């Protein structure tokens, strides 16, 4: 249920109440997942974005454990997994449909506040709510990996050389979406 998802999120983000309040206000826990990539098994049901993001966080944590990855902050895999796709909260919004007000649909926001973007837009949306480490910022910024626009590939490669976790973040996402 949405309440269970909110309770879980509140517990995980207890050190960042402003972030939890922002996500709660933006309907993160009930937002369906839009069909972003044609090959992605997306979840158009209530909570799809939450479940997808949590699965990325769990996959990144599993990679961390099995590959002995190190992070500047212990919570980084969770934060990166949960927050990398926050840009969706500016590009889409939930609308009730059907006989039940609990059924949700997804509409494209025709007048988002910020310009189009993925990781960069997520960072803009997050900057007033949590102080991310440089490592977390790079992982969120380049979470799309090779799907990052071509003109940014050289920066993506530099980010990987600076911190290998940038690559493993993209690996975790790919293992969830493909």
Language-model segment annotations:
Residues 1-103:
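Acidic/His-rich, divalent-metal-binding segments that scaffold phosphate/diphosphate chemistry
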Residues 7-11, 110, 128:
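A general boundary/transition motif marking the beginning of the first structured unit of a protein
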Residues 40-43, 109, 127:
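A general structural-boundary detector
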Residues 47-50, 109-113:
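Charge-dense, low-complexity intrinsically disordered segments
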Residues 71-81, 120-178:
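Histidine/acidic-rich helix-loop-helix segments that form or flank divalent-metal centers
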Residues 98-110, 156:
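Metal-dependent catalytic cores of enzymes that make or break cyclic nucleotides
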Residues 112-120:
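Phosphate-backbone recognition surface of nucleic-acid-processing proteins
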């Amino acid at each position: 249920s949405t309440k269970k998802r909110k309770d879980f999120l509140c517990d995980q983000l207890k050190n960042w109440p402003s972030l939890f309040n922002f996500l709660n206000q933006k309907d993160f826990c009930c937002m369906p997942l839009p069909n972003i990539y044609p090959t992605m098994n997306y979840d158009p049901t209530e909570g799809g974005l939450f479940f997808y993001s949590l699965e990325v966080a769990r996959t990144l944590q599993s990679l961390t454990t099995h590959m002995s990855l190190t992070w500047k902050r212990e919570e980084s895999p969770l934060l990166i997994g949960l927050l990398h796709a926050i840009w969706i909260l500016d590009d889409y919004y939930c609308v009730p449909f059907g006989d039940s007000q609990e059924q949700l649909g997804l509409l494209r926001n025709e007048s988002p506040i910020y310009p189009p973007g993925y990781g960069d837009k997520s960072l803009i949306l997050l900057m007033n709510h949590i102080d991310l480490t440089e490592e977390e910022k790079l992982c969120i910024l380049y979470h799309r990996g090779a799907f990052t626009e071509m003109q940014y590939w050289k920066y993506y490669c530099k980010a990987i050389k600076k911190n290998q976790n940038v690559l493993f973040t993209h690996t975790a996402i790919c293992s969830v979406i493909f």
